[in-house]
């Protein structure tokens, strides 16, 4: 009898809170409300939300469980909220789990959060500035050598990309590319994403009160998080034991010294080892599968468009001779490559639905009132497919970005105060990996000619998952075998 009684009490409290909230909102000029309350069960949510703009306009509300959420579906509304009024919408709602005061991605806006972001960004962009590009180049060359050993054999390229991006982050954070460590980290990230995407976890987004009831899925998620934390704690201990003042070989060294330097600072800005721990976690969770998925989408699109692949290879051959140095600062010398990356990010953004924002104070968007604590969700993919902005928005057409000033910058990594911390790293990885891959290989479908599906799998997590597919990597310094390959 205890469990049903507890559930009834929770429902009564939630209902009372909801009625009180609705009464307070009655005099405000709010965005229109979409009918229904099962919107978040749609298999391709960003596209579904974009479709609602036909009747409701680019900004509207949807009901998520017992609360209303505002959805932004255009560049104009997203930029107004996250750039022009970034302080108003820099907050985060209470999330499902985790060390909220330590988490950079999910933590709420505060002086401590700002200090945490500053240290993490400094570690990535200053601490690893000189070693990041050579490291990515080295690991990409090793990746190409592994792929050359499988030349002509169909390869599940997404798994290879995922291991590569995990190796890069392991080197940046831990200073270690040991294959056993990387495999352990990679498996942990995959387990976390799989657990997070399970319906038993996703339902908590719609009905948060269910988190107080027994939930095997939630217990499994917590167990995986504990395994993840054990790995990170081991690395932190090793780094502390070998730390030398004024020297660093990776991001952990840099951040540990940064924490030590501000030990006597103000309490509201004072960081500690737990912040370093969560910075590492955020980088692995946010930077492994997202970049690997974007690279996989790029390969899939190029398999469907061999004429663009051929033009890219001609550009690379013209600008980069054998053994030439590939430098990101010279990226504008490869305009078609940069345009192709931009087009892949437009059609398949790193995070199609940005993590929810919370209004830190009463504000407005497009003339609509947004009360304090209202949750805002920017539909990045929806904005990238807006027919009012993009010509033939669903078409893969990199040339659209070859005309300067004609197309807006896409917010594929978010924007404003909450822009993805790893954006510079991800853009560098996309540039180096695609350039070296297309220099070394021609991308071909399997012998049966099957092309990958360009329809994302049902969306429930961070990125747009690509259906599994295989690709043959034909070394360009070898003549294609007489098996009907395209040149």
Swiss-Prot record:
The EC category is oxidoreductase
UniProt keyword terms in alphabetical order: Endoplasmic reticulum, Heme, Iron, Lipid-binding, Membrane, Metal-binding, Microsome, Monooxygenase, Oxidoreductase, Steroid-binding, Steroidogenesis
Binding positions for progesterone?
Answer: 228
Which superkingdom is the protein from? Eukaryota
Supply the InterPro entries for this chain: Cyt_P450, Cyt_P450_CS, Cyt_P450_E_grp-I, Cyt_P450_sf
In this chain, 17alpha-hydroxyprogesterone is annotated as bound at 228
What is the species listed in this Swiss-Prot or TrEMBL entry? Mus musculus (Mouse)
Main role? A cytochrome P450 monooxygenase that plays a major role in adrenal steroidogenesis. Mechanistically, uses molecular oxygen inserting one oxygen atom into a substrate, and reducing the second into a water molecule, with two electrons provided by NADPH via cytochrome P450 reductase (CPR; NADPH-ferrihemoprotein reductase).
| Topological category with respect to the lipid bilayer | Peripheral membrane protein
What protein does this entry describe?
Steroid 21-hydroxylase
- What gene does this protein come from? Cyp21
Q: Where in the cell is it found?
A: Endoplasmic reticulum membrane; Microsome membrane
MF terms (GO), sorted A to Z: 17-hydroxyprogesterone 21-hydroxylase activity; heme binding; iron ion binding; progesterone 21-hydroxylase activity; steroid binding; steroid hydroxylase activity
Q: Which CDD domains match?
A: CYP21 (cd20674)
Q: Which residues bind heme b?
A: 92, 117, 357, 418, 420
**What are the annotated GO cellular component locations?**
endoplasmic reticulum membrane
EC number in record? 1.14.14.16
Q: Which PROSITE patterns match?
A: CYTOCHROME_P450
Q: Which cofactor does it need?
A: heme b
- What does the record say about domains? The leucine-rich hydrophobic amino acid N-terminal region probably helps to anchor the protein to the microsomal membrane.
GO biological process terms held by the UniProt record: steroid biosynthetic process; steroid metabolic process
Q: Which Pfam families match?
A: p450
> Which segments does the entry list as coiled coil?
none
> Is-annotated flag, keyword Transcription?
no
């Amino acid at each position: 009898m205890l469990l049903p009684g507890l559930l009834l009490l929770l429902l009564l409290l939630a209902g009372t809170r909801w009625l009180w909230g609705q009464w307070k909102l009655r005099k405000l000029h709010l965005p229109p409300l979409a009918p229904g309350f099962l919107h978040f069960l749609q298999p391709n949510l960003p596209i579904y939300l974009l479709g609602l703009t036909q009747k409701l306009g680019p900004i509207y509300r949807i009901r998520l469980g017992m609360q209303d959420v505002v959805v932004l579906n255009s560049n104009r509304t997203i930029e107004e909220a996250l750039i022009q009024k970034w302080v108003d919408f820099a907050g985060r709602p209470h999330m499902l789990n985790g060390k909220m005061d330590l988490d950079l991605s999910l933590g709420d806006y505060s002086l401590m959060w700002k200090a945490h972001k500053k240290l993490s960004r400094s570690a990535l962009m200053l601490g690893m500035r000189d070693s990041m590009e050579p490291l990515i180049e080295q690991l990409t060359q090793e990746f190409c050598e592994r792929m050359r050993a499988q030349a002509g054999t169909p390869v599940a390229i997404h798994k290879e990309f995922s291991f590569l991006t995990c190796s890069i982050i392991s080197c940046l954070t831990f200073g270690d590319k040991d294959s056993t460590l990387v495999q352990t980290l990679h498996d942990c990230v995959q387990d976390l994403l799989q657990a997070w995407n399970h319906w038993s976890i996703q339902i908590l987004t719609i009905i948060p009160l269910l988190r107080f009831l027994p939930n095997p899925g939630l217990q499994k998620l917590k167990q995986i998080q504990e395994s993840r934390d054990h790995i990170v704690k081991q690395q932190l201990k090793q780094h502390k034991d070998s730390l030398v003042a004024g020297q660093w070989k990776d991001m952990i060294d840099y951040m540990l010294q940064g924490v030590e330097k501000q030990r006597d600072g103000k309490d509201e800005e004072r960081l500690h080892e737990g912040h370093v721990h969560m910075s590492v976690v955020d980088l692995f969770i946010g930077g492994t599968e997202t970049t690997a998925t974007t690279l996989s989408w790029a390969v899939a699109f190029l398999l469907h468009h061999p004429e663009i692949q051929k033009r890219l290879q001609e550009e690379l051959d013209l600008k980069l001779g054998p053994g030439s140095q590939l430098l990101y600062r010279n990226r504008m010398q490869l305009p078609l490559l940069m345009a192709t990356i931009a087009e892949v990010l437009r059609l398949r953004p790193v995070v199609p639905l940005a993590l929810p924002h919370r209004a830190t104070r009463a504000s407005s968007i497009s003339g609509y009132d947004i009360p304090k604590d209202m949750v805002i969700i920017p539909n990045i993919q929806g904005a990238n497919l807006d027919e009012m902005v993009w010509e033939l928005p669903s078409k893969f057409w990199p040339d659209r970005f070859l005309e300067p000033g004609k197309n807006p910058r896409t917010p594929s990594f978010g924007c404003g105060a909450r822009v993805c911390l790893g954006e510079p790293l991800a853009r560098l990885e996309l540039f180096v990996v695609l350039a070296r891959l297309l220099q070394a290989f021609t991308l071909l479908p399997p012998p049966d000619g099957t092309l990958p599906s360009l329809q994302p799998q049902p969306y429930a997590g961070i990125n747009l998952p690509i259906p599994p597919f295989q690709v043959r990597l034909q070394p360009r310094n070898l003549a294609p075998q007489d098996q009907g390959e395209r040149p």
